[in-house]
């Protein structure tokens, strides 16, 4: 994001399009030009609500954006009452592909925000994305390790303690590149 805080996109409805949907193994396993496969190390869970052993339909969130201006961003939000202090880390597999072969690694980034609001009480973690080549079929190529978000929550505590020990203004965003 170009500025910290809650993001309100400018009115460019004619230029940038943004769609949120889902993709799944059952309906998109033969998708072209890149088929949908499970991320490395992930197995489909069994549906324990039936008497027959059946695998659940594993799926992922799709954020599809076209004509995004440099420095602009789009996001999907989920509000939740989950207390993250009960967990040690958050892990997310990220895949990036272009409509055509005109994207390069690092042209886009993925960010995740965790916090109580989107203006002053949040942590944000961002990584540049590697683009998957058309025709890729291996899970390791479709879900490259460089695109994996794996955040130990203790890093947020460490950064907050660092900010406080440096006597930084707690009312201004504190940025740490790791």
Show which residues each predicted segment covers:
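Extracellular/surface-associated beta-sandwich interaction domains
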Residues: 1-178
């Amino acid at each position: 994001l170009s500025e910290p805080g809650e993001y309100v996109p400018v009115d460019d409805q004619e230029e940038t399009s943004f769609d949120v949907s889902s993709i799944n193994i059952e309906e998109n396993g033969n998708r072209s030009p890149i088929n949908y496969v499970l991320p490395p190390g992930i197995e489909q869970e069994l549906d324990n609500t039936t008497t027959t052993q059946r695998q659940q339909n594993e799926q992922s969130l799709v954020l599809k954006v076209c004509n995004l201006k440099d420095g602009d961003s789009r996001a999907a939000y989920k509000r939740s009452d989950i207390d993250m202090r009960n967990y040690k880390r958050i892990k997310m597999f990220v895949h990036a592909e272009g409509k055509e072969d005109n994207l390069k690694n690092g042209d886009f980034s993925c960010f995740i925000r965790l916090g109580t609001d989107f203006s002053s009480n949040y942590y944000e973690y961002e990584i540049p994305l590697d683009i998957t080549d058309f025709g890729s079929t291996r899970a390791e190529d479709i879900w490259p390790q460089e695109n994996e978000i794996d955040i130990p929550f203790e890093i947020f505590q460490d950064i907050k303690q660092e900010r406080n020990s440096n006597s930084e203004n707690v009312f201004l965003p504190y940025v740490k590149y790791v």
